[in-house]
A protein has these predicted regions:
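Cytochrome P450 catalytic domain signature, combining two hallmark sequence patches
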Residues: 70-75
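Short, surface-exposed, polar/charged, turn-prone segments marking secondary-structure boundaries
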Residues: 49-52, 76-80, 108, 116-119, ...
């Protein structure tokens, strides 16, 4: 970990830039408007959303916003966050642009499917290796170790996964 990791205070999320995966759970089906993408049926399951954080506040600011939720709908994930519950997150501190690389690795995991084409991938359509979406659904769960081991750019020792349990569901109201 780098020096900025010492500045972390909220759930150990650093202020540095990096790539992350937000783990959300949807216990029952929802029909949901997703900004300009349109309205979609979201089936129950585990949802993993791949993003990057390179702006002010780094990973802590971006993950904090997603964990807490926001009244302002800016990103596609803000719409899903209205009905889905955070269950955890992966992250890697890095200045490398690994978002699409991680997304491609996640897309090849057993049981992964794309619930909404284009979800979270607005920036990808300008790249030669465009991603179909940055949101993946796993109906029957996923293997945390298998996923972590498949992420390029890191190793098991520097890719962090924090999982919330029914006994530990943090209060996200104190983060911005």
């Amino acid at each position: 970990m780098n020096a900025s990791s010492a500045d972390s205070d909220y759930l150990g999320i650093p202020l540095s830039p990096g790539v992350y995966i937000l783990h959300l759970v949807l216990p029952r089906p929802h029909y949901l408007q997703v900004g300009k993408l349109g309205s979609y049926d979201f089936l129950p399951g585990d949802y993993l959303y791949v993003g990057s954080a390179s702006g002010r506040g780094g990973l802590r600011a971006r993950l904090g916003r997603h964990l807490h939720g926001s009244d302002r709908r800016h990103w596609h994930i803000d719409w899903l966050r209205l009905v889905a519950t955070p269950r955890g997150y992966f992250y890697l501190e890095s200045r490398e642009h690994l978002e699409c690389v991680w997304n491609q690795a996640l897309a090849h995991q057993p049981g992964a499917c794309i619930p909404v084409p284009g979800f979270g991938a607005s920036d990808c359509n300008r790249k030669p290796t465009a991603c179909a979406a940055h949101l993946h659904r796993f109906e029957l769960g996923f293997d945390e170790d298998l996923i972590r081991d498949s992420f390029p750019g890191g190793s098991e020792s520097n890719i962090v996964y924090r999982k919330f349990t029914p006994d530990f569901q943090p209060d996200f109201s104190d983060i911005e």
